[in-house]
Each structure stands twice: as C-alpha cells, then as structure tokens.
Amino acid sequence: MNVTLTKAELADLLFERVGLNKREAKDMVEGFFEEIRQALERGECVKLSGFGNFQLRDKPQRPGRNPKTGEEIPITARRVVTFHASQKLKAAVEQLSDASKQP
C-alpha cells in the first residue's frame, strides 16, 4: 500500500469538507507550504502541534567513497531539513499499523 497525498488532493479535501471554492482551497494549500518554506529559509524551526517539527541541521564535511572505483571523495558540508514526528502522530500511525495486523 503506497498511496501518496498530493497538494491538489489536499485542496480538493478543503473544497469538499470546509466549503472553500477550488481557487481558495488551492491558494490556502500553496500558502501553507510557502510559509513553511520561508520560515525554514530564515533558519526558523517549524512546529506543527500534534504533527511534528521541521528543523534545519548543518551536516559537516565527511569522507565518502566512489562505489565504482573505491576512490575516497569528500562530501561537502551542507544544510538539510529534518522532520521529527510528534508523539501524537507516532501513536496514531502505530495504532493504524497494529489494527491492520489484527485478523
């Protein structure tokens, strides 16, 4: 079971459940993700209560290896975005996982 929820589908859900028109729903979804992106660009942590946290992490340079030649190649330092799920989200996912294992 590998189903993906897209931004377009989120907008459709807002249209159906909240009653926004399709344009407003699309703009709301786009605006939501744009705010998260801008906050991360400013170096801020994004905390969504009951869902999780998006944080920036600086990874130092480290040695890597070319898998074909075995030659050591440095992997440059970089900044990455990490996501840590909240305990509520972890518990909900675990509950679904446990329920699907029941006969």
UniProtKB/Swiss-Prot annotation:
Alphabetical GO biological process terms: DNA recombination; positive regulation of metabolic process; regulation of DNA-templated transcription; regulation of translation
SMART domains tied to this protein: BHL (SM00411)
GO molecular function, one term: DNA binding
UniProt keyword annotations, A-Z: DNA recombination, DNA-binding, Transcription, Transcription regulation, Translation regulation
GO cellular component: cytosol
Alphabetical list of Pfam families matching this protein: Bac_DNA_binding
Gene3D superfamilies: IHF-like DNA-binding proteins
SUPFAM superfamilies: IHF-like DNA-binding proteins
Subunit structure comment from the entry: Heterodimer of an alpha and a beta chain.
HAMAP family, per the entry: IHF_alpha (MF_00380)
General function of this protein: This protein is one of the two subunits of integration host factor, a specific DNA-binding protein that functions in genetic recombination as well as in transcriptional and translational control.
Homology family: Belongs to the bacterial histone-like protein family.
Protein name per UniProt: Integration host factor subunit alpha
Organism the protein comes from: Aromatoleum aromaticum (strain DSM 19018 / LMG 30748 / EbN1)
Gene name linked to the record: ihfA
